[in-house]
Amino acid sequence: MSSSRTEQLVAGIQSWLQCESPSNFPDGIAAMARIIADYAAAAGLTVELSSLGPTTGPLLYATNRAPGDTRPGILILAHMDTVHPVGTLLENPVRIEGDRLYGPGSYDMKAGIYLALTALAGVARPGATQLPVDFLVVPDEETGSHASRVHIERFAANAKYALVCEPARPNGGKCVTARKGTGMLNLNVKGRPAHAGMQHEKGRSAIREMAHQVLALEAMTDYERGITVSVGTIAGGTVTNTVPALCRCVVDFRVPDMGAAEDVLRRMRELCAVGPDVELDIDVELNRPPMVKTAEAAALLALVQGYAERAGFLLEDAPMTGGGSDANFTSAMGIPTLDGLGADGDGAHTLNEYILVSTLEQRLKFWELLLKDLA
């Protein structure tokens, strides 16, 4: 390690990685929230923890706002939940190998939270930044931010800028200014059961009907337009000697803009049964609207690139990515938004997830300059 500061950053991040906080483990998320809250409070930030219900971890809010300061400020967004189940640390322990710090949730996105919060801790006193800074850490981003979305949008309504701690894109630590919108279709087919040997002709196979629907859905994929439709799970039938009466599938779709979103939603809602005497139950929604690179976001990027240069690295803009994040919500509200400002590394959602130790000081310096001077 190059310096004592890097050693301190590594030690802090390692301690956070020891707390497993998968999305479906509210107790673990609550423990992680308490760790983050204690760190923020010790720095002098105002901290609030809010319950989002028994099946979801708490929402964490930290700020350097002075009492009564209602000016639009900087909103930092992060999430404390991970995709890794409890017990992952046993097979993928926190460790350093060369320049890589491995551990579940390291890259996505506990190191990013640690860097941004450490920078904010240095300007915790009200008035130490040009704009007030609000830091919101949600417990359910990996599962769609269903419980926290309303709170994200509430804070974003009073934000001049939104900065998101999702990990930097691999191979250069690029930031993100455009993300596809994400949606989900739950399709249920109801047929008619019958004995598969004695009364086969009286049955109406839900699986047969679903096969037609799967082909129609997958055909909605249009790579030239940036649209993908993927039937992710499918289940149907009960026993082999009964014509299946029920079949269901769950479909993921990604769209680059609202025009494409409206087109896909319309086509899915207009799905019709191919066979006789079967029914379709269609439940489809756009979970995250597309994050489109606006002129305002481009201007913010140009400004922020100057802070990165002063911190010692080149901050490039990544192409539109197919994965969604909470940046989709703020961008859709018209808030200039930059994403992918977290730690540099690779391997999100895998057991090979890591961050690059040699980049930590530069990324921290970047956040320090950004929070102090952005106006």
Regions found by a protein language model. Give the residues of each.
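Metal-dependent amide/peptide-bond hydrolase catalytic core
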Residues: M1-S4, S21, Y39, S51, ...
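Short glycine-aspartate micro-motif
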Residues: G73-L75, L101, D108, K160-V164, ...
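Short beta-strand segments
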Residues: L77-A78, L136-V138, A162-E166, N188-K190, ...
